[in-house]
């Protein structure tokens, strides 16, 4: 699994790690503060759901045709592409396409 530290996650340092295996995991992060609100806030609780898809670009097109707007792109990475959608109740969905079968490359957060 992956894990690491971000010195400035929207104004606060956090540490995080994956619980699971190379193909299915839950990401746990520190830095929680206060009640659950928008995903960019600093709260203890559920941040987002990640779903692996075979083709992110095709997904973006399908969701756009269905009326869903892209919230933001993930960071550029050689072994994955991810996008995020925010639904009306504040739940963030991450859709991720992997370009590698190797867990160490899929879950590399140093690139």
Give the residues covered by each predicted segment.
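A glycine-rich, hydrophobic loop/mini-helix early in the fold
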Residues: 25-32
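Core segments of cupin and vicinal oxygen chelate
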Residues: 1-24, 65, 73
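Vicinal oxygen chelate
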Residues: 14-21, 37-111
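Active-site donor-binding loop signature of nucleotide-sugar glycosyltransferases
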Residues: 19, 30, 97
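Short, structured motif recognition centered on aromatic/hydrophobic residues
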Residues: 26, 46, 93-95
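Short, surface-exposed linear segments at secondary-structure transitions and domain or protein termini
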Residues: 35-40, 104-107
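A cross-kingdom feature marking solvent-exposed beta-strand/loop segments within repeated
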Residues: 33-37, 72-73
């Amino acid at each position: 699994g992956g894990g690491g530290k971000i010195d400035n996650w929207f104004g606060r340092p956090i540490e995080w790690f994956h619980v699971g295996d190379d193909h299915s995991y839950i990401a746990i992060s520190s830095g929680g503060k206060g009640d659950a609100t928008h995903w960019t806030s600093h709260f203890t609780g559920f941040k987002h759901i990640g779903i692996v898809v075979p083709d992110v670009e095709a997904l973006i097109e399908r969701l756009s045709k269905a009326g869903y707007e892209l919230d933001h792109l993930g960071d550029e990475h050689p072994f994955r592409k991810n996008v995020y959608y925010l639904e009306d109740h504040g739940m963030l969905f991450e859709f991720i396409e992997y370009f590698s079968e190797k867990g160490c490359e899929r879950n590399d957060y140093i690139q």
